[in-house]
Design a protein with these regions (language model features):
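Functionally critical loop-and-helix segments that line ligand-binding/catalytic clefts
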Residues: 104-180
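Sec/Tat-exported extracytoplasmic proteins
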Residues: 18-21, 47, 51, 82-85, ...
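Catalytic cores of transferase enzymes with a strong primary signal for eukaryotic protein kinases
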Residues: 28, 44-47, 58, 86-90, ...
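Short, solvent-exposed mixed-charge patches
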Residues: 212-213
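Substrate-binding cleft of extracellular glycoside hydrolase catalytic domains
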Residues: 1-87
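Catalytic domains of cell-wall/extracellular-matrix polysaccharide-remodeling enzymes
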Residues: 53-128
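Amphipathic alpha-helical oligomerization/assembly segments
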Residues: 177-208
Length: 213
């Protein structure tokens, strides 16, 4: 989502991701040459709700503006996003842009960093922009391949465990078992026992088929 552009499949993908159980967040591409409040007004009208993950401010354009304006409007957009959705947004950027144009600003480390630095594994650790000491997400490639998607895609690492990612998205990393799970487990145990008895009758010794070294 940008100052005047929205992916024509955004609404479809937004609803589809929820239906598929995929953690969701939307990102706004900052235009430093436009009013920050108007930009976030438009973003909020398109997205309409908070995501599972924090929404994202994509900071990598100058808009042919001086660094002072880029800094001011970046920080203003971050404040606006937090005010609209009740959660500090992620900052998506790269050292090559952030450090020379914005630099180490007071309080910026309060916003989690989604850093872009290609290409892992040649690059073992991303270069973190001024103002942060660590990252929450690392976009390590823009040439990835994912089953079911013919085009190249971006790939990312999360700086934590799966349980920490679930908690970050507001979920319970240790949810209770779904209703009716115990009868299904008992059925699986019974079927496994029947399969084991049959396999042992065919010469299986519990480790490998007889005669195979």
């Amino acid at each position: 989502i940008g100052h005047s552009y929205t992916d024509d499949r955004f609404a479809q993908n937004w609803l589809g991701a929820r239906a598929a159980g995929i953690f969701r967040a939307a990102y706004h591409v900052l235009r430093p040459d436009h009013d920050p409040v108007a930009q976030i007004d438009r973003f909020a009208s398109v997205v309409g709700e908070a995501g599972d993950l924090p929404h994202v401010l994509d900071v990598e354009l100058t808009g042919e503006q001086p660094d002072r304006v880029i800094r001011e409007r970046t920080l203003a957009c971050l404040r606006e996003l937090e005010g609209r959705f009740g959660r500090k947004p992620l900052v998506y950027t790269a050292d090559w842009f952030w450090t020379p144009h914005i630099g180490a600003q007071p309080g910026v480390a309060d916003y989690d960093l989604w850093v872009a630095h290609y290409y892992w594994p040649t690059v073992q650790e991303p270069k973190v922009p001024a103002g942060w000491s660590t990252w929450r997400l690392w976009q390590h490639s823009n040439r990835g391949q994912v089953a079911g998607i013919p085009a190249r895609v971006d790939l990312d690492f999360f700086g934590g465990t799966m349980e920490e990612l679930i908690a970050y998205a507001g979920g319970d990393p240790n949810p209770p078992p779904p209703p009716g799970i115990e009868p299904r487990v008992r059925n699986l145990e019974r079927w496994a026992g029947e399969l084991d008895a049959w396999a042992r009758g065919q010469g299986y010794d519990g480790v490998r088929p007889t005669g195979i070294g």
